[in-house]
Amino acid sequence: MPSALAIFTCRPNSHPFQERHVYLDEPIKIGRSVARCRPAQNNATFDCKVLSRNHALVWFDHKTGKFYLQDTKSSNGTFINSQRLSRGSEESPPCEILSGDIIQFGVDVTENTRKVTHGCIVSTIKLFLPDGMEARLRSDVIHAPLPSPVDKVAANTPSMYSQELFQLSQYLQEALHREQMLEQKLATLQRLLAITQEASDTSWQALIDEDRLLSRLEVMGNQLQACSKNQTEDSLRKELIALQEDKHNYETTAKESLRRVLQEKIEVVRKLSEVERSLSNTEDECTHLKEMNERTQEELRELANKYNGAVNEIKDLSDKLKVAEGKQEEIQQKGQAEKKELQHKIDEMEEKEQELQAKIEALQADNDFTNERLTALQVRLEHLQEKTLKECSSLEHLLSKSGGDCTFIHQFIECQKKLIVEGHLTKAVEETKLSKENQTRAKESDFSDTLSPSKEKSSDDTTDAQMDEQDLNEPLAKVSLLKDDLQGAQSEIEAKQEIQHLRKELIEAQELARTSKQKCFELQALLEEERKAYRNQVEESTKQIQVLQAQLQRLHIDTENLREEKDSEITSTRDELLSARDEILLLHQAAAKVASERDTDIASLQEELKKVRAELERWRKAASEYEKEITSLQNSFQLRCQQCEDQQREEATRLQGELEKLRKEWNALETECHSLKRENVLLSSELQRQEKELHNSQKQSLELTSDLSILQMSRKELENQVGSLKEQHLRDSADLKTLLSKAENQAKDVQKEYEKTQTVLSELKLKFEMTEQEKQSITDELKQCKNNLKLLREKGNNKPWPWMPMLAALVAVTAIVLYVPGLARASP
C-alpha cells in the first residue's frame, strides 16, 4: 500500500540541513539527534541544539485524508506560519498542516559565555497524498492566519480582531513566564548572597583565630625573653612597660579593624535586608501584575464578545433597515402612483371645470340676453295690447254707434291679437338665435364687439315699431312668431336646468378634490410616522454604539494605565537591580580592602616574627629548651598559617568562582532584561497598533452610522451598494472609504431628487391652492353677477324699456370682468 510523503526543504534563515523525504506510514517523531538516532534523509531528526529530543509528531490520517502536526511538550515551541501551537513545555492539540506551509521548530538561542547564536529549523513542507497528488495549498483554503485544530469547529473561528487579542494575550503570557524565570534567578541570587555571607562569617572567624594565635605567640615570646634575660628589675619593668604598650597598640588596632569589619558586616546585612524587601516587593508587584493581566484578559474576552454582539446587532439593524427601506419604497411607490392618479384626476377635473365654467359663462350670457329680450318683448306686448285695446275700444265704440253685429268683429280682433302674439314669439326666437351667434362672435372679439348687440337692439326696437303695424296686417305670421317665442322660452328653461346640472358637477368635482387632498394628507402623515419610527431606531442604535465606544475608551485608558504601571515597575526593578549590582561591587571592593589589610597584617607579623627569630638566635645559647618549644610553636604556627592561607586561597578561589558565576548570571539577567525591554517595546508598539486599529474601527463605525442616517431614503440599488460596502469593510478599509464616498454622493443625488420631488409637490400644492382660490373667486363673482342680474331684473320690471341699452352695457362690463381673468390665466 503506498504511503503519504512529506518533504522538508531548508529555508535561508534556518539552521542548515539536507532536504528530507519522510514517508508517513506511521506517526514520525521530530527531534534532536542522539547516539541512537542520527540524522538522515529519510527521517525527521536534525542536528540542532535548539530542538528537544521528542520535539513534535507528524502523521497522515487515512480516514480524513489530512496531515497533522502536534507539539510534544517541547521547550522552545513549534510554529506553523509564525503561529505557536502551544505554550512552553505543554502538549498542543493536533493541528492540520497544508502543502506549502512554513514550519519552524524552536527559536534562535544565544549563549552568554561564548556569545554564540544557535539557529532553529525553518522549513517549507510539501505534502503528497498516497496516490501521488500534492495536498491542497493554504491559498486554496479560506484565508486564516492559524491552522484549525481538530477539536475546533470552523464556524467558531475568531475574527481578525479577536485573533489579534489572542496574540496579545499570548505575548503577555510569555512575558509573565519570563518574569517568573527572572524571579527564580533572583531567588538563586539571594541564596548565593546568603552563601557568601556565611563564607564571610567563616573568614572572619578564621581571622579572629589567627589573631588569637598571634597574641599567644607574642605572649610566649615575651615569656621566653623574660626567662632568657638575667636583667635587673628596672630593665624588666621597662621591657614590661614597652611590651604592654605594644600589646595595647596591637589590641587597639585589632579592635579598630574588628569594629570596621563589624560595621561593614552590619552594612552588608542591612543592604541584604533591603534587597530582600525589594525582592518581596517585586514579588508582590509581580503577583499584582499577574492578577491585573488575568483581569485584562477577561476584559479583553468580554470586549471581544461585546464587539461580536455589536457586529451582530449592526447586522440585525441593517436587515431591519433594508426591510424598512423596502416598505418605505413600496409606500413611496404607492404614494407616487396615487399621487399620479390624483394629479391626473385633478387635471381632468380642472379641464372639466374650465369647460363647465365656459359653459356656465356662455349659458349665463345667453340667459341674460334672453331675459333682456323677454323683458323687451313683454314691454312690446304691453304696448301692443294697449294699442289693440285702444283700437278695440274705438271699434266697439264705432260699432256701438253703428249698432251692427259685433261678434264677428270681436272674433277678428281676438284673431288679430293671437296673430300679433304669435308674431312676437317668432321674432323673439329668431332674435335669440341671432343673439347666440352674436355672443360667440362677441367672445372672440373685443369690448367694442360686445357693445354691438346693444346697437342692434336699439335698431331692432325701431324696426319693431314698424313691424307692429305690419303684424296687424299679417296675423298668421305673428302667430307662428309667438309659437317660436314659446319654444325659445322652453329652451331657456332647459338652459337653466343645464346650468343647475353643471353646478352639481362642479360641487362633485370639489368634493373629489377635497377627498384627494385628505388622502394626500393621510399619506404624508403615514410617511412622517414611519420616518419618526425609523429615526428613533437609528437614534437607539447610535446610542448603543456610543455606549460601546465609551466602554472601549475606558478599556483603552485602563490598558494605558496598566502599561504605564508596568513600565514604572520595570524601571523600578531595573533601578533596584542596578543598585544591587552597585552594592555587590562595593562588597567586592570591601572584601578586597579587607584582603589587602589582612595581607599587610600578615606581612607585618612576618617581619615581627623575623625580629623575634633574630632575638631567639641571640638567646639560643642560654635557653635550648625554650628554643625547642619555640621551634615547635613556630612549626605549628607555620602549619596553621599555611592551613589558614590555603583555606583563604580556597575560599578566595571559591569566591572568585562564585563571583564569576554571579557575573555570568548577571550578564544573563542583563540580556534577559534587554530582551524583556525589547519585548516590552514590541508589545507597546503592538498595543499602539491595536489601539490605532481600534480607533480606526471606531471612526469607521461612526462613519457607517452617519452613512446609515444619510441613507434613510435610499433605494434598492443603494442597499446592494451598502452590502458591498460592508463586505469590502471586512476586507479592506481603503476600498470601504472609496465606496462610502460613492454611496454618499449617490445618497446626496437621491436626496436632491427627493428635494426636487418635494419642491414639485409644493409647487403642485400651491397651484392647487391657487386654482381653489380662483374657483372661490369665480363662484363669488358668479354670485355677485346673479345678484346684479336679480337687481337688474327688478329694475327692468320697475323701469320702462328705453333703459335697455344701459342694461346691455352693464352686462357687457360684467362679461369683460369675467372673461379677462380667464384670458390672463390661459395666457401663461
Curated annotation (Swiss-Prot):
InterPro entries: Cent_Immune-Sig_Mod (IPR051176), FHA_dom (IPR000253), SMAD_FHA_dom_sf (IPR008984). The chain crosses the membrane at residues 803-823. Residues 167-202, 230-388, 477-799 form a coiled coil. This is Sarcolemmal membrane-associated protein. It is found in: Cell membrane, Sarcolemma; Cytoplasm, Myofibril, Sarcomere, M line; Cytoplasm, Myofibril, Sarcomere, Z line; Cytoplasm, Cytoskeleton, Microtubule organizing center, Centrosome. One of its GO terms (biological process) is negative regulation of hippo signaling. CDD domains: CC1_SLMAP, FHA_SLMAP.
